[in-house]
């Protein structure tokens, strides 16, 4: 009888412990869902707060969820320009060497270096990116940044190979067209340059600068 009582008590304690250990799960899930939603909407500061809360309550054995949280925290750090962003990337790569997220993180780090005008570092990052594994939008961003880096190095041929890959329907096309038109202008390919700058007259980004180049082309061709 005594043995049965002890057995029932042990079950009760076990159940109480299990219930207590899972009591925070709904709150953790709520933090995680809010964090992911904020992340998807580019609200990096708020997303980081929610994701940190989610990580505190996450099951340490749930490696997949931890990996996803750590990936999103690393992206938040990159987007916010945090001082520890590079350390977080290194830690992520060490902790999850086979993660599918490593390629996206290298790409995001390259974008960060571009925003800081640290183009040699950006080039090194992009050189380790698997281009084919990127989605369509990231590929276009990659091509635009790589084209700009090569343009800045005066390697117009290589720059053109990147700019030419950007689809005319892309949100980044006007940027690519501007540099392609400028390269044509610099090479005295004025007919091609004129065609490009005329298309940019309606561009929100380049509509004001395009007339200057069109006027210069007319002058260089003696049309004055």
PLM features: residue spans?
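Hydrophobic helical h-region of N-terminal Sec-dependent signal peptides
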Residues: 9-15
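Acidic, polar-rich low-complexity tracts and alpha-helical solenoid repeat scaffolds
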Residues: 2-7, 18-224
